Amino acid sequence: MARKGILGKKVGMTQVFTDNGELVPVTVVDVTPNVVMQVKTVESDGYEAVQLGYGDMREVLTNKPSVGHAKKADTTPKRFVREIRDVALSDYEIGSEVKADEFAAGDIVDVTGTSKGHGYQGNIKKDGQSRGPMAHGSRYHRRPGSLGAIINKVFKGKKLPGRMGNHTRTMQNLQVVAADTEHNVLLIKGNVPGANKSFVTIRSAVKAAK
């Protein structure tokens, strides 16, 4: 089955009432009409995909390659460009727009974004480990625990202090509560990855119940 997709920007969270009176937490995603920047085919690119662009880039940040690429679609360079695979290429034409009506209430989607960055953190905050005793002469408070049975080797994957967050994450099987075509907004049930004002990619769910 062909998938659909659209790019947007996370606005924030709110809550809405459904028709039966249920209060549902939703994430508001701005989906200002995307522009089809490129249509990739097996013959020309080795795979099928449609390239979408969201949000105009400031002119001072553009360069000649980005301007030339956008010119083929009769548009301006975009801030956020991503590809959507497994789509029906016949539904897309270079330079056309993809709007909020791409999805409807009740659709199940996967949302990909960049999680909030927390910088360099220790085991307690990063991995949820327990701290040591804080009194009675203990000299072990927030340090990592044992590194394993072999004294001169640290096994791959060992949880140690390091950078936390700022990873690409996908939340699957989220429900579209409403699609507001007048204000170019999608309301998605629950939360989606990333901070407010961060870019997200919304695709038809790959594991949705059939």
Curated annotation (Swiss-Prot):
Region (Disordered): 119-143
Domain of life, per lineage: Bacteria
GO biological processes: translation
Keywords in alphabetical order: Ribonucleoprotein, Ribosomal protein, RNA-binding, rRNA-binding
GO cellular component, as recorded: cytosolic large ribosomal subunit
GO MF annotation, one: rRNA binding
Subunit: Part of the 50S ribosomal subunit. Forms a cluster with proteins L14 and L19.
Function recorded in the entry: One of the primary rRNA binding proteins, it binds directly near the 3'-end of the 23S rRNA, where it nucleates assembly of the 50S subunit.
Family listed: Belongs to the universal ribosomal protein uL3 family.
Record-given protein name: Large ribosomal subunit protein uL3
Encoding gene, per UniProt annotation: rplC
